[in-house]
Amino acid sequence: MALVRGAEPAAGPSRWLPTHVQVTVLRARGLRGKSSGAGSTSDAYTVIQVGREKYSTSVVEKTHGCPEWREECSFELPPGALDGLLRAQEADAGPAPWAASSAAACELVLTTMHRSLIGVDKFLGQATVALDEVFGAGRAQHTQWYKLHSKPGKKEKERGEIEVTIQFTRNNLSASMFDLSMKDKPRSPFSKIRDKMKGKKKYDLESASAILPSSAIEDPDLGSLGKMGKAKGFFLRNKLRKSSLTQSNTSLGSDSTLSSASGSLAYQGPGAELLTRSPSRSSWLSTEGGRDSAQSPKLFTHKRTYSDEANQMRVAPPRALLDLQGHLDAASRSSLCVNGSHIYNEEPQGPVRHRSSISGSLPSSGSLQAVSSRFSEEGPRSTDDTWPRGSRSNSSSEAVLGQEELSAQAKVLAPGASHPGEEEGARLPEGKPVQVATPIVASSEAVAEKEGARKEERKPRMGLFHHHHQGLSRSELGRRSSLGEKGGPILGASPHHSSSGEEKAKSSWFGLREAKDPTQKPSPHPVKPLSAAPVEGSPDRKQSRSSLSIALSSGLEKLKTVTSGSIQPVTQAPQAGQMVDTKRLKDSAVLDQSAKYYHLTHDELISLLLQRERELSQRDEHVQELESYIDRLLVRIMETSPTLLQIPPGPPK
């Protein structure tokens, strides 16, 4: 055998060899009828065989000799099945000896049968097609009528014809991928009846060849059983059944395959369309569902804590940017907030409940984002609510002196107004830094009266400005918090200033507070005094420590006003208590903690402020995460157990 194989001629490099053959059984004509009666009919099906592979078509019931199937299947050719024929044709020497062994594998056998309910299926005819001859005629698709013959050794009769299409392919999908069943031994009549009584679906025993479009499969056994059930009414079954296993191998992912598979294996009833829809086609359910849910945001609308409102949710810009710019970013506000998966819809604006005691001094309207604008509009009214009354009574006797001092400082700092970085250079020609001293504005009795109120308002007020710092600049927040909390004797920053200088500083400060220009430009580098918060200790020590910080804040505010070019007229204040301020300023020997910041430059103060702001921002983020968690937990409780949130009725009075 090795010598014979060695004598094989080499195949031409340009010769095309198929690996599969695709057979399509279209129809038949002139078949013999097997049923009794005048109009003889038959339940015909065809068995297709190449080598040892067998496949069967569906059963066409009660056909009058002209059934139509239009079903196809594919067979894999054995290796070297057509090589001998090709080499013999190329050599013009006839069939080669090595081609005889593969001759049986190159024959297509078509056997037409009649499906009988009881007994063996009846033979209708058989046709044998030589595939090598068909392939020798060319690679094109061949459609031809083949005559049906009798079995070998039997008398030849007129059995009709069958039309078949043969197509050779290469590297095509095999029909075995469809789990097509082979035509094994014929079953006994009793096994068929037993299967039908049990209602068994015989997918493994009927044809699984592919169906061309616009065709339906009919169960061969169920077809004859339906005819018999008309008389007896016992074996009545559905006659037609579509199966995805009988689809063509050329339509693996087609719509007909998917719909047929879902229709035959899934529930057939109301709502079956939703059950059998493929995931790719049912994706519109989720998208449209999300669209519907987005259009109805009133499912869960609730307000969060006092730090923000449902209709004023915002995303705050970086706080370093607030320090450098000093104004609000209008694009950072938003009227809609998505907290996790919850949509906060816009609701009617109402009073907000705050956890601080300062809500009595501020207007109780929608949000605290417009605090600066309200302070600008109300002017003297907000000043009356914020500052001590003793300071208002003493702010009218030093207007002329304050105006002169502001004019002198404006002349000195005029070059610094054009360039913010030259403020330090503008102070050097004077030989000493600009220090502002503010006189005492209340007696010791007023300090004793407001000591208790200051302790109560200290924590809530700082908490309020901690959460709602966006509407005010940093210098204004520090100044208001420190002055609003202390409200007592204020000591100057330097013991070397005279009483006239103190009166000038005080009159210019309160004159600016009462006249409040809304168009005033902020300083390019607002600096917040770090010692504005109250310090633990005795009352005298607290007052002495906070005096320098207040003086520093007022001096920076005055410099900001001078550089911005908006000097407001001031009112004259009386000089009552001026000598007491001078004595306290000279007698104070306690070192203020804010003195350690005097040697720092403007840039160093800004960097220190930015560091503190980063720490506060981290704390705010943590608080916001906790608030979001509480909101999600509340919504989850509302969804799962809303009865937990119901207030039980109180006892009858």
Swiss-Prot record:
Molecular functions per Gene Ontology: gamma-tubulin binding; small GTPase binding
GO biological process: cellular response to acidic pH; insulin secretion involved in cellular response to glucose stimulus; negative regulation of adiponectin secretion; regulated exocytosis; regulation of protein localization to cell surface
PROSITE patterns registered for this protein in UniProt: C2 (PS50004), FIP_RBD (PS51511)
Note: Antibodies against RIP11 are found in sera from patients with autoimmune diseases such as systemic lupus erythematosus (SLE) or Sjoegren syndrome (SS). It is also found in the sera from mothers of children with neonatal lupus erythematosus (NLE).
Tissue-by-tissue expression: Detected at low levels in heart, brain, placenta, lung, liver, adipocytes, kidney, spleen, skeletal muscle and pancreas.
Name of protein: Rab11 family-interacting protein 5
Functional description taken from the UniProt entry: Rab effector involved in protein trafficking from apical recycling endosomes to the apical plasma membrane. Involved in insulin granule exocytosis. May regulate V-ATPase intracellular transport in response to extracellular acidosis.
Domain FIP-RBD: 586-648
Biased composition annotated in UniProt, kind: Basic and acidic residues: 375-387, 420-430, 447-460
Assembly: Interacts with RAB11FIP4. Interacts with NAPG. Interacts with RO60. Interacts with RAB11A that has been activated by GTP binding. (Microbial infection) Interacts with Kaposi's sarcoma-associated herpesvirus/HHV-8 protein ORF45; this interaction results in the lysosomal degradation of ORF45 and the inhibition of viral particle release.
Biased composition (Low complexity): 357-368
PTM statement from Swiss-Prot or TrEMBL: Phosphorylated on serine and threonine residues. Phosphorylation at Ser-357 is PKA-dependent.
Domain description: Binds to vesicles enriched in neutral phospholipids via its C2 domain. The interaction is favored by Mg(2+) rather than Ca(2+).
Entry's localization field: Cytoplasm; Recycling endosome membrane; Early endosome membrane; Golgi apparatus membrane
Record field: compositional bias (Polar residues): 277-286
